[in-house]
Amino acid sequence: MMNEFELINHYFNWPLSDPSIELGVGDDAALFEIDADCQIVTSTDTLSEGVHFFKDVLPGDIAYKSLAVNLSDIAAMGAKAKYFTLSLTLPKLDEIWLQEFSESLKEASEFFKVSLIGGDTTKGPLNITITIMGVVQKSKAIKRSGAKNGDHIYVSGDLGDAALCLKKMNEGIKPNSSVLNKLNKPVPRIKLGPALINIASACIDVSDGLEQDLTHILRASKVGAILDSESLPLSDSVQDYLKTSQDLGLPLCGGDDYELCFTSDQSHQAEIKKLSESLNIRITKIGVINNSQTLEIRGYEGSSKSYQHF
């Protein structure tokens, strides 16, 4: 049986293609260089079995999502991801599971052009923790605190598919492949995020639900907003669900969307439309910022059902 160091070397010591990395996996710490006019942006997310994914989810899907959700955080800051570390807690040494996990993670890292530079392994309940690092030009990072009165509120993509998938699975109903992919293989908006620099006044990735995540922007910016529930971008699957359930709480509060919600001055409407077309990403105006210090959701009477970690 492999020991910890053999496991790391066999499954995760991949060839490095980024010349900025001097030391990666295998030393006490990583060593890399960044340009003098850049700032480092870093974020950490943990995915736990039974909380963030079901026990029967494929190891390749777990690997992909673990990286994708971290990339989404970096994109929300307008940064470009460069490096990541992996901390893997395993209940047992399952070489077939590890092989599938490693291959998928390597494939995803190559696709998104981000390099694994270190990490750790230990024994325990299945947990995957990734810390990701990106770079952004100094003073250009998009924060949550920049929204201004009169700004328009936008969101990328569609909302509610991942939540619908979870709902169906919890009810013992097999979801269609479209919503299942939205849950297991979210697409981080790594091109949209950096493109929003000088356009977005504030930005956040929608991980815990639009209502809750937009509220983070409002609190950080000390503003309020009016959100139009009829403007929410919804897939055919979610629209079909709403026809019978009228459950607007699902797309508003469901979470796991990993889309970008951002605010922008009205003068940027034409630029945002061009971005949507050039990146082939649906970008929808869903509301307006005001000075009320509250969030009013027109057409929705329900209470918050956004994801709570505790």
Feature roles, as predicted:
Residues 59-83, 100-111, 189-191, 195, ...:
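Small-aliphatic-rich amphipathic alpha-helix that forms the alpha element of a beta-alpha
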Residues 148, 153-157, 186-210:
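Internal active-site segments that recognize and position negatively charged phosphoryl groups
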Residues 165, 171-187:
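A short, charged helix-loop
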Residues 2-13, 91-115, 122, 126, ...:
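Glycine-/charge-enriched secondary-structure boundary and capping motifs
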Residues 34, 40, 47, 80-168, ...:
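Glycine-rich anion-binding loops of enzyme active sites
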Residues 31, 70, 78, 116, ...:
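Residue-level signal for inorganic ion chemistry
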Residues 24, 41-43, 115-119, 154-157, ...:
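General beta-strand structural signal in soluble alpha/beta enzymes
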